[in-house]
């Protein structure tokens, strides 16, 4: 459990708002906070709650059959700052007309869209076809990156990682061009080099490749693909290694080092398109092989100026109070 809807729910709980709150889970075995109703995704109760709820809070699209009724308020938090182009901004042929029109239909039902930055406030409404109210509040899911300190030790202990070890989180995104014969997304893993003594590796497969991540898992890595809250992993890690994933924007709230393993950079950019010059603005070094990256892990270079510029551009509101601002704006202070 996690992400912005969860943090918004927790803020409402703190305020004893009196709202009857339900939280959607994928499995009946998942736990929800006291006083919150558990609703299993795909169940009859879930369909009923979609129809009856006054407020809907989601970080992704609702099912195609859903039609917002009069009086419902739909708060869309979205699920990350984009490097790669989205929706109608994709000009490379990677997006079908069906996808673009379906996205626009979905966005037409949103009343509010949460944004972490002026960059997203400009890009997301245009790309997704949204014309409602943008709440440039910061991402509620990132509040804990600012406010929590005890989580780091707890998570590392649960993973069997000592305080003295350097914990590297490898979190690659999925590829439009990589699918199996069945149509599922293929796993992605370019981290094929061993870490030196004193370093440990966590592997976090993308949600789209969960069914394939086992075969992609780097040897000796700690598999955290199904760990429930990636924010815990950001707090536990000392270094992030990613490629084009939006985790780069969230992790940068911590101020900890990042490196980018991008052997297919030219191909990926040509296929999807980027919103900015990634090579010029990246807040850490870019590597074309894992062996090069591992050799440089002890000294990733001075990226302080680029890192600071990155945070100002993409994380200007991340002060630990984003959920407070969203709740104030939607439900009233």
Question: Where does each model-flagged region fall?
Answer:
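Conserved catalytic-core segment of nucleotide-activated headgroup transferases in glycan assembly
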Residues: 1-16, 127, 137-216, 287, ...
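A donor-sugar binding/catalytic signature common to diverse glycosyltransferases
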Residues: 56-78, 82-85, 227-272
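A short beta-strand/loop micro-motif in the catalytic core of glycosyltransferases
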Residues: 56-57, 111-117, 202, 240-241
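C-terminal alpha-helical cap of glycosyltransferases
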Residues: 318-333
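Catalytic binding pocket for nucleotide-activated donors in carbohydrate/polymer assembly enzymes
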Residues: 136, 216, 246-314
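A nucleotide-sugar donor-handling region in carbohydrate enzymes
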Residues: 81-180, 207, 306-309
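N-terminal pre-catalytic "stem/leader" segment of glycosyltransferase-like enzymes
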Residues: 1-49
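Donor nucleotide-activated moiety binding/catalytic core segment of transferases
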Residues: 39-54, 207-249
């Amino acid at each position: 459990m996690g992400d912005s809807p969860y943090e918004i729910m927790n803020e409402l709980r703190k305020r004893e708002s009196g709202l009857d709150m339900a939280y959607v889970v994928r499995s009946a075995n998942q736990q929800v906070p006291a006083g919150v109703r558990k609703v299993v995704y795909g169940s009859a109760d879930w369909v009923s709650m979609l129809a009856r709820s006054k407020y809907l809070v989601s970080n992704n699209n609702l099912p195609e059959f859903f039609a917002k009724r009069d009086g419902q308020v739909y708060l869309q938090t979205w699920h990350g700052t984009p490097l790669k182009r989205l929706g109608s901004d994709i000009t490379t042929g990677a997006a079908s007309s069906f996808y673009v029109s379906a996205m626009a239909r979905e966005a037409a039902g949103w009343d509010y869209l949460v944004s972490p930055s002026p960059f997203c406030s400009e890009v997301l409404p245009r790309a997704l076809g949204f014309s409602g109210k943008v709440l440039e509040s910061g991402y509620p899911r990132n509040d804990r990156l600012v406010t929590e300190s005890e989580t780091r030790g707890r998570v590392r202990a649960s993973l069997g990682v000592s305080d003295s070890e350097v914990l590297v989180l490898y979190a690659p995104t999925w590829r439009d061009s990589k699918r199996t014969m069945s149509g599922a997304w293929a796993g992605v893993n370019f981290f094929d080099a061993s870490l030196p003594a004193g370093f440990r590796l966590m592997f976090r497969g993308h949600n789209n490749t969960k069914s394939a991540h086992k075969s992609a898992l780097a040897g000796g890595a700690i598999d955290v693909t199904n760990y429930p809250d990636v924010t815990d992993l950001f707090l536990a890690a000392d270094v992030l290694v990613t490629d084009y994933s939006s985790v780069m924007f969230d992790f940068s709230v911590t101020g900890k080092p990042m490196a980018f393993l991008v052997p297919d950079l030219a191909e990926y950019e040509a296929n999807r398109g980027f919103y900015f010059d990634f090579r010029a603005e990246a807040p850490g070094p870019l590597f074309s092989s894992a062996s090069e990256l591992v050799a440089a892990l002890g000294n990733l270079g001075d990226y302080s100026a680029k890192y600071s510029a990155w945070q100002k551009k993409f994380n200007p509101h991340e002060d630990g109070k984003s959920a407070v601002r969203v709740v104030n704006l939607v439900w009233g202070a």
